[in-house]
Amino acid sequence: MIRYIFITGGVVSSLGKGIASASLGALLQSRGYRVRLRKLDPYLNVDPGTMSPRQHGEVYVTDDGAETDLDLGHYERFTGVSARQSDNITTGRIYQRIIEKERRGDYLGATIQVIPHVTNDIKEFVLSDPGEGVDFVLCEIGGTVGDIEGLPFFEAIRQLGQELGPQRACFIHLTLLPYIPAAGEMKTKPTQHSVKELRSIGIQPQILLCRCDRPIPVNEKGKIASFCNVRLASVIEARDVGHIYDVPMAYHAEGLDSEVLSHFGITDAPPPDLSSWQRIAQTIKNPDGQVTIGLVGKYTDVPDAYKSVSEALGHGGLANKVKVDIRFVDSEKFDDPDAALEDLDGVHGILLPGGFGERGAHGKMRVARYARERNMPCFGICYGMQLSVVEAARNLAGIKNASTSEFGPTKEPVVGLMEEWTKGNEKVTRDASTDLGGTMRLGAYPARLKEGSMVAQVYGSLEISERHRHRYEVNASYIERLEKAGMIFSGMSPDGRLPEIVELEGHPWFIGVQFHPELKSRPFEPHPLFASFIAAAVKQSRLV
């Protein structure tokens, strides 16, 4: 029997529903249960693929090529369960699907309405394809209770709660308890009003997860329980912690997983095994050293734009038992060829993340040259790899007009638009006029590594699979000239047509990858490239 847990949020946005969902999933996993986590996003975009990182943060790509919300990255990192296209839905995708069915005549002339057609599609999404042997499906509802665009989702889960019954459905509401210094007390009224709003649409939460920055007094917990109609033990203190990987243990200490099991009447659950989380906490609290990594991109004012990269760097630190201090550096500042690169002083490694467009790209190329000439560890990802190759083509291979066609027409397209590639058994064709949404090379693709290369040593294998999200690729017709200049194309697509990994001959650690390795890194299994990169940064820190 599959049980469903719905996580909603109130009072304000950005309370951490994604981390809360991932943490609860990890706690249930630690007791031997199998979980699947899903995200329901109320916005009208079909997916976040064309949304600005400044508005939405990063786009998280799954193995099967879905462009999804960054919360799915939290789900994967905390539980190790690979997300799928079927684990993220938006209002836009639901409406798109319904309109397609209406145009085909599937509704046989019926009037299409939010209730029942939209809500039925939402319910179908929640219940469909949970996976084999899954015990719990956790569904996070994006946005805040009371948002107009979220009403169909709340109505759908209300109906599911009624249809499944309390033995199979549980509602958890994440809320805020602000502390007012002038009054010297914690205020429960926002939580009461948030729950009142939720109850007005027919949902009675069984558990309240109360975000706060200090302990909740017992009398305040009692007041919340009384006015929100929940058990006292179901008012869970979700106090701020030092690191997100402390959250599962903090929530367990407050009894969150026990309350969930109690609601479902499960009395024979095995005790949780949190030893792996405890080891991570110890490493985070007691590192053997510290390194500073310069993350050079154009969205550095919005750290969520590089969420998975930041997390993967931290995982690399865990693998090497060091703290990783990330210095976010705006690449646009370096577009001016006369601008000093003093922001890179004191860093022990440089990471050039993915991105799009010409703005900030020339600055990234200057930074790639800086790292290349100073023998500093440098890790280029996706666009970062492409720009590193363009820089080397200009300044090592002597191809003065080398550029990327992403900037516009060029005589020397060292990086060009991919027009054809293979996805499974299907040939995919694109051109410059193709729509932007969902038209990139997306999802997991295999690659073959060059025997004896640095990456082959790092991976410990000659065959790998990594996730991609790109429209441009290094032009294979330039490989011979670039290799003569000292570049090593150490990873290629199985058909030998698409360069996937590049190294720099004679450099202690200079690797560029066309894929996004950060998407497959986990705290318990740091990605080998990030572990190796941080190891190189540790070595660099001892040289300066």
Swiss-Prot record:
Its EC number is 6.3.4.2. The lineage of its organism: Bacteria, Pseudomonadati, Pseudomonadota, Alphaproteobacteria, Hyphomonadales. The active site is at C382, H516, E518. This is CTP synthase. It comes from the Bacteria. Homotetramer. GO terms for biological process: 'de novo' CTP biosynthetic process; pyrimidine nucleobase biosynthetic process. Catalyzes the ATP-dependent amination of UTP to CTP with either L-glutamine or ammonia as the source of nitrogen. Regulates intracellular CTP levels through interactions with the four ribonucleotide triphosphates. Mg(2+) binds at D71, E140. InterPro entries: Class_I_gatase-like, CTP_synthase, CTP_synthase_N, GATASE, GATase1_CTP_Synthase, P-loop_NTPase.
